Each structure stands twice: as structure tokens, then as C-alpha cells.
Regions:
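N-terminal helix-turn-helix DNA-binding core of bacterial DNA-binding proteins
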Residues: 1-37
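Beta-hairpin "wing" of winged helix-turn-helix
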Residues: 48-62
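Amphipathic alpha-helical dimerization/coiled-coil segments
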Residues: 77-106
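Basic, amphipathic "hinge/linker" alpha-helix immediately C-terminal to the N-terminal HTH DNA-binding motif
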Residues: 60-83
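Short alpha-helix boundary/capping motifs
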Residues: 55-57, 73, 97
Length: 106
């Protein structure tokens, strides 16, 4: 899995409560992603068997069904591993030099 910013944010949202089912709008808010980014990402995670999904039957007439997503057991394991590796890479990355102050020679 390629660990991009959106992937990292979605996995972090899932891992805040790994057993809890999450629906799309909930994940959009938690990960701060637009639907055009989130849903293709969820589809890829499903294809990789890291996320499972199920449709909820509306309880009242007129309610729209919701599709709930949940990390699989393997998804939890991979998400934790990938997030730990991403964190370690950030800690090892050399600090980026700052810009010199205006008028300085540096």
C-alpha cells in the first residue's frame, strides 16, 4: 500500500476505534477529505481486503441506506504497521533548512 496523506488520515480515523463501523460522511469529516478522494480510496482498500463494507437497512421509511466500512483483522494489522513506519520515516527525515531572513547573505 502506498502511504499517501489521504490514506494515512483514513487509516488513522479507522484506528481511533478499530471495531466501530464507519460510514462515508463520518470518515469524510474525521479524515477531512472530499468524497471524490475518500470513496475511491475506500474502494481500493476494499479490493486489498483491508476494509469490509455492508449496507445498513433503513430503520424508518424515507431514510437512505448507509454503507458502513470497517477495517478487517488484516486491515488493522497493516494499518498499524504502515502508520508506525510512516511515523518512523518522518522522524528520520533530515530537517529542511529554513529560508534565510530577507536581506541576509545566508
Amino acid at each position: 500500500m502506498r502511504m499517501t496523506g489521504p490514506v494515512e488520515r483514513v487509516l488513522t480515523a479507522f484506528l481511533s476505534d478499530p471495531a466501530a463501523p464507519r460510514y462515508g460522511y463520518d470518515l469524510m469529516k474525521a479524515a477531512r477529505l472530499p468524497s471524490g478522494t475518500l470513496y475511491p480510496l475506500l474502494a481500493r482498500l476494499e479490493q486489498q481486503k483491508l476494509v469490509g463494507s455492508a449496507w445498513e437497512t433503513p430503520q424508518q421509511e424515507g431514510e437512505r441506506p448507509r454503507k458502513y466500512y470497517r477495517l478487517t483483522g488484516e486491515g488493522v494489522r497493516i494499518a498499524r504497521l504502515e502508520l508506525a513506519q510512516a511515523s518512523a520515516r518522518r522522524q528520520r527525515a533530515p530537517a529542511r533548512p529554513g529560508r534565510p531572513a530577507p536581506g541576509s547573505l545566508g
